[in-house]
């Protein structure tokens, strides 16, 4: 089961995201944080597989949070959530290695597609690691 951290400053959206994650059999919510700073603090002591990360938050926006995650070399995948469908934001997120973008408002089906995309990429990476290990043995 994949562990998910939800980082969202709007309590209602955080609750909806938690419900959407819980509806997917392969995921569990490990924690919710209301801003990037508290998310970084949580990640210091806890491992998660995926972060659902809002772009617009107080104190530290989602992009700065993601830059700090990458700088600290925390091995985690990220799905960004934003209310704005701006090309520059999308490019910046892709440059920082996000798995997918969710543009508010989104449906459960769209949310599930993003989670399934994460699973596909995570499983492909595991397969690649297994192949590399077998190659090293021979």
Positions of PLM-derived features:
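CheY-like receiver
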Residues: 120-138
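Short amphipathic alpha-helix used as the core "switch/output" element in two-component signaling
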Residues: 63-74
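Two-component/phosphorelay signaling modules centered on CheY-like receiver
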Residues: 10-31
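Receiver (REC) domain active-site loop signature in two-component systems and cognate sites
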Residues: 57
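A Lys-centered signature of the CheY-like receiver
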Residues: 104
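Active-site beta3 strand of CheY-like receiver
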Residues: 46-52
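Helix N-cap/capping motif at the beta->alpha junctions
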Residues: 32-41, 62-65
